[in-house]
Amino acid sequence: MAGSLNKVILIGNVGRDPEIRTTGEGKKIINLSLATTETWKDRITSERKERTEWHRVVIFSEGLVSIVERYVTKGSKLYIEGSLQTRKWNDNSGQEKYTTEVVLQNFNSQLILLDHKNSNQNTQGSGHHEYKYPETKNHSFDHSDLDDEIPF
């Protein structure tokens, strides 16, 4: 196989107000929790069932950070595109822990506010704000340079 794909697309609701942090270099990073809910009808009881999955989202893109800072609060409905990343860290007792997050970088990431309600605008849930970095295309890509070997 010549390539792979790491892409996550989610539509869900923000579980709490986004957490904004600033790095030592002054760069802002946002952490938020996004809930997606599946619903189905139980075959035996005909009862409506649902299951909510919580996703950790980390936003590094300066443009997306700016939009989230201004418009996103607990309950906001978002469409996001990003990639999955797992990071390793040590807790206070020195034990290794792993966290998998949906990461929005400066490239291949998108965020759309699906139900933006701003008191200064009369959107009534019909408008949305979108911020997307333009994708670059390399029209002179040479497929003969691809390494077809399995990496393990």
Curated annotation (Swiss-Prot):
UniProt entry keywords in alphabetical sequence: DNA damage, DNA recombination, DNA repair, DNA replication, DNA-binding
PROSITE patterns, alphabetized: SSB
Pfam families: SSB (PF00436)
Presence of keyword Protein biosynthesis: no
Compositional bias segments (type: Basic and acidic residues): 127-144
Record keyword Plastid present: no
Region (Disordered): 118-152
GO cellular component, one term: nucleoid
Sequence ranges assigned to domain SSB in this UniProt record: 5-111
InterPro entries membership: NA-bd_OB-fold, Primosome_PriB/ssb, ssDNA-bd
GO annotation terms (biological process): DNA recombination; DNA repair; DNA replication
Single GO term (MF): single-stranded DNA binding
Segments carrying motif Important for interaction with partner proteins: 147-152
CDD domains on file: SSB_OBF (cd04496)
DNA-binding region: 54-60
Subunit structure and binding partners: Homotetramer.
Function: Plays an important role in DNA replication, recombination and repair. Binds to ssDNA and to an array of partner proteins to recruit them to their sites of action during DNA metabolism.
Name this polypeptide is given: Single-stranded DNA-binding protein
Protein species of origin: Rickettsia prowazekii (strain Madrid E)
